[in-house]
């Protein structure tokens, strides 16, 4: 879904064989795979065992946590601090591609990740933060409100919030980073049908609080209804979105 964002950032930063990249919240590893295809050495960090299993299938098909004899590729479950190695060079690029600006507390959560990650990066390293664009330019915003409504019994856990244009800059400032440019990228979400769209959106983790507050069946039903306005005559689902990214530097 966010492939255009990954490509825009990697092109801007000239990610390649000289790059040592740390991917925060790497999920199923697609962004890491794209960096590896450019020759970068990558380390992916996430807390979801299920998503990291998918990342390992993509990047480490032999089942190891690192790929010996090639560009360093590591998958780590835990926090960025768990990826630290005394014998490893500093990272030159740190990415946080999971966009903020849709859930209460997501900016604070990103700040905590950066507190652990920035010390692992070298001076002048690029730190990339991503966020949702304005709600009026993100068709998926209306669907995310469904998650907020269903998660309401948990009061604050995963509650939807509108994005703020200065979200990324504030997070960077709190982390002691120096802004060095930004951009916007169109990332439409397209699915073959409603069921595929529901599965795809649920796999992002954005609806986990809703599932915890209700159940999987209820979330599936509500999501399908919210997606109906975005369904085309041929049955496909199409939701135009715009995402923003900020490039900041480690001083």
Region spans (language model):
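Class I S-adenosylmethionine-dependent transferase superfamily signal
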Residues: 35, 116-117
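Conserved catalytic/acceptor-binding region of the Class I
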Residues: 111-112, 118, 122-190
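Conserved alpha-helix/loop element of class I SAM-dependent methyltransferases that forms part
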Residues: 1-19
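Conserved Class I S-adenosyl-L-methionine
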Residues: 28, 169-251
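A short, conserved alpha-helix within the catalytic core of class I
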Residues: 102-116
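Class I SAM-dependent methyltransferase SAM/SAH-binding core
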Residues: 20-22, 28-83
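A short acidic, Gly/Pro-enriched loop at the edge of an enzyme's catalytic core
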Residues: 81-94
């Amino acid at each position: 879904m966010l492939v255009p964002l990954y490509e825009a950032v990697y092109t801007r930063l000239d990610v390649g064989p000289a790059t040592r990249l740390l991917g925060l919240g790497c999920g199923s590893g697609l962004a890491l795979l794209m960096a590896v295809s450019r020759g970068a050495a990558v380390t992916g960090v996430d807390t979801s065992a299920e998503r990291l299993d998918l990342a390992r299938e993509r990047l480490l098909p032999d089942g190891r946590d690192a790929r010996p004899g090639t560009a360093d590729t590591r998958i780590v479950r835990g926090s960025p601090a768990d990826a630290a190695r005394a014998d490893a060079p500093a990272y030159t690029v740190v990415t946080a591609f999971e966009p903020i600006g849709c859930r209460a507390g997501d900016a604070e959560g990103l700040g905590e990740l950066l507190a652990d990650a920035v010390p692992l990066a070298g001076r002048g390293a690029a730190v990339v933060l991503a966020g949702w664009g304005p709600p009026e330019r993100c068709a998926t915003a209306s669907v995310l409100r469904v998650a907020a409504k269903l998660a309401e019994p948990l009061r604050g856990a995963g509650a939807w919030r509108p994005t703020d244009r200065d979200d990324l800059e504030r997070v960077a400032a709190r982390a002691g980073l120096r802004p060095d440019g930004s951009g916007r990228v169109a990332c439409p979400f397209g699915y073959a049908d409603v069921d595929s769209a529901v599965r795809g959106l649920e796999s992002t983790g954005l609806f986990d609080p809703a599932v915890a507050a209700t159940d999987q069946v209820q979330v599936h039903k509500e999501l399908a209804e919210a997606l109906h306005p975005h369904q085309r005559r041929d049955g496909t689902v199409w939701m135009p979105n715009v995402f923003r990214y900020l490039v900041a530097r480690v001083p």
